[in-house]
Each structure stands twice: as structure tokens, then as C-alpha cells.
């Protein structure tokens, strides 16, 4: 006997058959699925997950480490200085010997262009800008700045921390036990400036703020012109408030439509606030991490304070390495041309990340991300309460990610939602598999969260 269905009953019967045939793809928004559909989807996803676990994979997307191919771009630099090389700087200084506390002139000229300041505002350091940031905080903590008492003698002080942000920044200020870190939410234009202004201009215990202004770590956001201008126009309640402007990705573009960052130092000069910023960068992700050259830029007042410490700390940093870098690049244009080679290696990896996220998660309503024009990371926000679960699932399947919460002060993500993806190190084939597993784990964690509601 054939039973004829009509009206709504016919519609729902047909819909049910089609849904069964297509495996639920009609309703791909997980937050719109009913319990039965979610449970069915979860069963299939877990079976796929067990298959990956059985493969015994060891894949790494934890940190922004340049790949072997990127490191090989700078190998010719190792041949620049040989036993018969002239080791004199442009000023005639013998780079093999002691001296020149703030670095050779040609290095200061190059980094001045990278940071957008004059050479006299530049201090050349060793192989690590993070080291210079730590030394700066230590100097102000132990010796003070702007004629004020050392921070260590001022009791509990505060440092503003835009988040998600760079975990090693938070590690530096977290090391100093009298510094309380205050989370400032990031927006699409940079830190929440209403909140920044409220803290800085009304609380004299607020002494500084961390910033990665171009291609921020991990969001890949570049601060808007308005944000930079508001930083430059700050009227701090504390004379010794300083902006730690870590311009780590100042020339690390990935697309043909790169972001542009307004020059903070120029804007500060317009406002009579040239003492506000301490600016940093390095060649760590340009040549060899750990064997590069770092630099900071600041006003004369700030440099005088910093040099008063550095003159006891060192006689001068590695001038041969400075010379090697300068002769390898020749000039700023040489650095820019070199970065195009990095772009050729990195861009396909970032394109793959965005493609995989869009294909696997784009219509699931369980994750969001920013498509950066440069930098080293893609920041993914999964459903609230799921980041730790996703990272744990990935680890069990052999995928190493930055720890959930690491992008927030004290390692505490209030929403447990942010995950940083670092695609630079793995080869494309390994990256593709790691991303497949990441997306799979994101789906599993999301469905389990939705079923728990």
C-alpha cells in the first residue's frame, strides 16, 4: 500500500530524506542544529579524530618560527666578513675592538628608517629586542625615568596589556612582582582607546602599556591612524608613563595591499610628547633569529636614562654582526627587497590557513578570525569555553599549539576562546594536515559545548 503525504507532512518527510542523504550539510550552522543532528555529527567527527590519532603525528604550529627555507635566504650573509675583510665602520671605527656603546653609525641609520626616526634617536642592541624591552623595564624599575622615583620604590604599579597580545611581553612585566597587569581589550582598530585614556589620564600608578602596532601578535591588526593619534595625545597622570611600542613586524608584509602605520614618534612630537614612546624592532624574522640585530628608538631624555644603565651593563654590542648585516643589505631598500623573498615563502601558508578555516568552519557559526596582511600569526576565536578543549584535543592528535590563555596576562583568557595559529614553520603539506585536525577539534569541542547547554 502506498501512503500519499501532502502539505506540511510531505515537506518534512522530503526534508528528512534529503537531510539523511546529504549527512546534514543543509543545516551546517551548528548552533541551529537540533540535538539529534549534533549527536550524529559528533559521532562522525570523533571517528575521523580517532583515525588521526592513530597516525602518531608530530606537527607544530605553536610559535612564530621562520622555516628552514626562510633561514636559507640569509646564508650569503655568513660570507660577508672573512679573515681578509675590512672591518672598519663608515666612521673609521674598528668593529673588531671594544667601544661604541650605542652601535655603529650605519646601523643606526638603517634602523632609523625602519622605525621612522632620526639616527640620533636610535640605540643598537644585541641579538634580541625582547632583551632590550626587559632591560628598559628593569632600568625604569631600578633607576626611574623622567626624574621620578624608581618604579620599584613606588609600591604597586600598573601596566596596560592589550589582549589578545604577545605572551612574552606579559612574561616581562609579570617577572616584576610590583607590576599589576591590566587587560585592555583589542578592537579592529587596536586597543580600546577609551579604556586606555581612562586608565592613563586618571591613575598615576599606571606606568606603561605594551603595543605591537603593526600586524599585532596574534590578531594581525594594524592600529588605525586615530588610535596612533590618541596615543600621541595622551596626557598621563604619571610623568613616568611610557608606551612600549614593539614594532616587530614593521616591514613584514604578506600581501600586495599591505597595511600602513602612522608614525607615532612624529605624532608625539606634534603634541610635545616625544618622551612617551620607547620603540623597538629587530632583524630576528628578517635574517637569523638569535643571531640578528636589535634596536630601540627614543627621545634624548629617555636615551640618556637608558644609556646611564647600559654604560655599566656593556661596553657595546656585537659590531661585527652589525657590520655584516649592513653590508648584506646595503641600505633600507635592500631590506625591503629581502622581505619580498620571505613573503614568497610565507604568503601561501597564510592563504592556506584562511582557505582551510573558511572551508571547514566558515558556515558553522562556531569560530571567527582575522585575515591579516602581514605578521606571523592568525588569531582564531572559538566558542566561549572551548579554547582549552581544542588545544588539548589537538595535542592528543599530535598537533602542538600555543597554550590556550597564553595571549592574555597571567595566562587567563576570560572567555577561554582565543587560539593563536603560527603557520610559518611547517612545510605546506604538514600545515594542511595540522589545519585539518585543528578544524576537526574545533568542531568537536563546539558540539560538545552546545550539547552541554
What label would you give each PLM region?
Residues 9-26:
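Short, Lys/Arg-enriched N-terminal segments with co-localized hydrophobic residues
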Residues 26-28, 35-36, 41, 87, ...:
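PLP-dependent enzyme catalytic core of the Aspartate aminotransferase-like
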Residues 28-102, 106, 112-113, 396-399, ...:
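N-terminal "arm"/small-domain region of PLP-dependent enzymes with the aminotransferase-like
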Residues 45-53, 302-303, 307, 313, ...:
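Conserved C-terminal alpha-helix-loop-beta "cap" of PLP-dependent enzymes
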Residues 60, 340-354, 366-381:
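Conserved glycine-rich beta-strand-loop-beta hairpin in the small C-terminal domain of fold type I
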Residues 93-239, 250-272, 387, 439, ...:
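Conserved core of the PLP fold type I
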Residues 266-347, 360:
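Conserved core segment of the aminotransferase class I/II
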Amino acid at each position: 500500500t502506498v501512503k500519499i503525504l501532502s502539505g506540511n507532512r510531505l515537506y518534512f518527510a522530503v526534508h528528512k530524506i534529503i537531510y539523511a542523504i546529504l549527512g546534514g550539510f543543509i543545516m551546517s550552522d551548528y548552533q541551529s542544529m537540533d540535538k539529534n543532528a549534533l549527536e550524529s555529527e559528533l559521532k562522525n567527527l570523533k571517528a575521523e579524530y580517532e583515525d588521526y590519532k592513530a597516525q602518531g603525528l608530530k606537527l607544530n604550529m605553536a610559535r612564530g618560527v621562520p622555516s628552514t627555507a626562510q633561514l636559507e635566504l640569509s646564508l650569503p650573509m655568513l660570507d660577508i666578513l672573512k679573515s681578509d675583510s675590512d672591518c672598519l665602520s663608515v666612521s673609521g671605527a674598528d668593529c673588531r675592538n671594544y667601544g661604541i656603546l650605542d652601535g655603529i653609525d650605519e646601523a643606526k641609520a638603517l634602523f632609523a628608517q625602519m622605525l621612522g626616526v632620526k639616527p640620533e634617536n636610535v640605540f643598537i642592541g644585541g641579538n634580541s629586542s625582547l632583551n632590550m624591552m626587559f632591560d628598559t623595564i628593569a632600568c625604569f624599575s631600578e633607576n626611574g625615568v623622567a626624574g621620578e622615583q624608581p618604579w620599584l620604590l613606588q609600591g604597586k604599579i600598573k601596566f596596560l596589556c592589550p589582549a589578545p597580545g604577545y605572551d612574552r611581553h606579559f612574561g616581562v612585566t609579570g617577572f616584576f612582582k610590583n607590576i599589576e597587569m591590566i587587560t585592555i581589550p583589542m578592537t579592529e582598530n587596536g586597543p580600546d582607546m577609551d579604556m586606555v585614556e581612562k586608565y592613563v589620564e586618571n591613575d598615576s600608578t599606571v606606568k606603561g602599556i605594551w603595543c605591537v602596532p603593526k600586524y599585532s601578535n596574534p590578531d594581525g591588526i594594524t592600529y588605525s591612524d586615530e588610535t596612533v593619534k590618541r596615543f600621541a595625545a595622551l596626557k598621563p597622570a604619571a610623568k613616568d608613563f611610557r608606551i612600549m611600542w614593539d614594532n616587530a613586524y614593521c616591514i613584514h608584509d604578506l600581501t600586495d595591499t599591505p597595511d600602513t602605520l602612522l608614525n607615532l614618534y612624529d605624532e608625539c612630537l606634534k603634541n610635545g610628547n616625544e618622551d612617551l614612546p620607547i620603540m623597538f624592532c629587530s632583524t630576528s624574522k628578517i635574517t637569523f633569529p638569535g643571531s640578528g640585530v636589535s634596536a630601540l628608538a627614543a627621545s634624548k631624555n629617555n636615551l640618556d636614562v637608558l644609556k646611564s644603565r647600559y654604560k655599566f651593563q656593556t661596553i657595546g654590542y656585537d659590531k661585527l654582526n652589525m657590520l655584516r648585516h649592513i653590508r648584506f643589505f646595503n641600505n633600507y631598500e635592500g631590506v625591503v627587497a629581502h622581505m619580498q623573498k620571505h613573503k614568497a615563502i610565507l604568503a601561501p601558508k597564510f592563504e592556506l590557513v584562511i582557505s582551510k578555516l573558511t572551508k571547514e568552519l566558515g558556515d558553522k557559526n562556531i569560530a571567527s578570525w582575522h585575515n591579516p596582511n602581514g605578521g606571523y600569526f592568525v588569531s582564531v576565536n572559538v566558542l566561549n569555553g572551548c579554547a582549552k578543549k581544542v588545544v588539548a584535543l589537538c595535542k592528543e592528535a599530535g598537533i602542538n599549539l600555543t597554550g590556550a590563555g597564553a595571549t592574555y596576562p597571567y595566562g587567563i583568557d576570560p572567555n577561554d576562546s582565543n587560539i593563536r595559529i603560527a603557520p610559518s614553520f611547517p612545510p605546506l603539506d604538514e600545515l594542511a594536515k595540522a589545519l585539518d585536525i585543528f578544524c576537526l577539534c574545533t568542531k568537536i569541542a563546539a558540539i560538545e559545548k552546545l550539547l552541554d547547554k
